[in-house]
Amino acid sequence: MRRHGDHASGDDHVVVRGSARVTADPARPAVAAELRAGLAELARREMPGIADASDIERYRAASAARAEPPETLRARWRLHAAERGEAVTVLTASRAPRPAALRVVFLHGGGLIAGTRYAGADLAGRFAEELELEVWTIEYPLAPAANFDAMIAAVLDVLRDATADGAPVVLAGQSAGGGLAAAAGLACRDAGVKLAGLLLACPMLDARDTVSAAQFADDASWDRRSNAVAWEAALSGSAAQPPGERADLAGLPPVFLDTGSAEVFRDSIVDFAGRLWAAGVNAELHVWDGAYHSSDFVTEDAEVSRAAHAARRSWLLGMSASAVS
């Protein structure tokens, strides 16, 4: 098993591409002891399963009922909020003394079917004061009412606005938001919209069957069936491919990716990082030993969670330094 910060390669991270199925019953990597109580609590919450599209609205309602109030996040990180139209909230440190060093546009998780602009905004919000970030968090349209094409278009519109004044912009996303960020990053490349970088935290890149998808088929944080149904809803009528299935990755800005060794998306993320390197893209990959999907948002004070936060902080700091050099 890989340790903090190692990129994965070799026989313990085998990716099954295309429509091939995983037929073996691979051994399931262990969740770190310090994270098990949080995972057990997720299981006790009994979020509705997503067996098919008819379960999506029930899942979305349950997700909304469990969501943290926006005021809680703003108070935790001492953030000031200003609305920028109907779909964007701009978060800045309340005592920001000067213009932000870096603008971060954030896309929330929720499987492309649930969530709000504040869900997971700690990803960048926790660093807003220290690193002088301006965080734009987006309420993008959700499936099945909107498809993946519409989501990408909505994000691209915001990114055109965010980059219009020449400010350095990092596009960041967590889980489903990370996958959407990867797709929107490709759209920016094609449209000539310049981004400073992409920060993809445990991104939901595709619905392929991989070893890790089989290992965590029934995971309490996000399982294989839910992933397949969510992607089916998002891709209905959409011309866009999931970013994990795209072959044309050259020309992207620097990319940060991370994943847990004990999560469903692990192998898709590791494979994506390898293909970024093959395409000549500057990519940084971390595989967090014993972490499950989004565990750093559940048990923030765990050693492995603190390591994940520190790695993201370091990468954002590097982006800020590059922007002013």
Regions picked out by a protein language model, each given a short descriptive name:
Residues 27, 31, 35, 42-49, ...:
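Alpha/beta-hydrolase superfamily serine-hydrolase fold, recognizing
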